[in-house]
A protein has these predicted regions:
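A shared catalytic/ligand-binding motif for oxyanion handling
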Residues: 1-188
């Protein structure tokens, strides 16, 4: 089972889209969470369904030149039901090889008013019950290992450290439009 989360900063460009397609084929991804599609949700779903017939997709519209979320998954390995939420896309169901129900959240965290955003997410209860995978652009540093020098420590990092979450570090792949060719997180 290979899951990935990728911040594209615009999905419409030909180099990005063709490289993303090669990524799907070469790595045999089972589920991908995309942030910052900068695209209409319905159009991006249709685009992916043409390339990957039989796969399932769910998308949230971009707001002007920012935002836009997409989840795409292989129904042979992921039996998931999508729910569009004010703060992201929630997928609920089962992954091949796991008996327990899993919740997968793809979100794009805000730059401003982050505390009320995370308080709202925490109060809805999905962070506490059962298996949970969160991917996305959090606009937040959640690992204390990432703080250095006189960097201001974000109180939300303490919230995550209190949840007993396991952070998954990046696995490298060559994608030309990203700095140093680093891809989003890949979980195997």
């Amino acid at each position: 089972m290979i899951l990935s989360t990728i911040n594209l900063r615009g999905i419409g460009g030909n180099p990005k889209f063709s490289t993303l397609r090669r990524l799907f084929v070469l790595i045999h991804l089972d589920l991908v969470m995309v942030q910052e599609t900068m695209f209409d949700g319905h159009k991006v779903c249709q685009l992916f369904l043409k390339l990957f017939p039989g796969w399932e997709v769910c998308a949230i519209d971009a707001s002007g030149r920012f935002g836009g979320l997409l989840c795409i998954w292989n129904p042979l390995t992921c039996d998931l039901a999508p729910f569009a939420l004010p703060f992201g896309i929630l997928l609920v169901g089962h992954l091949k090889g796991f008996d327990e129900e899993v919740k997968i959240l793809n979100l794009y965290g805000p730059y401003r008013d982050r505390m009320s955003f995370w308080d709202g997410l925490a109060s809805c209860g999905i962070l506490h019950d059962g298996l949970f995978i969160m991917g996305g652009d959090l606009n937040l540093t959640v690992s204390t290992d990432e703080f250095w020098g006189n960097t201001h420590r974000d109180p939300l990092a303490d919230y995550f450290s209190d949840l007993s979450v396991q952070l998954v570090w990046w696995t490298c792949a060559r994608i030309p439009w990203l700095p140093l060719g680093i891809m989003g997180e890949v979980v195997t």
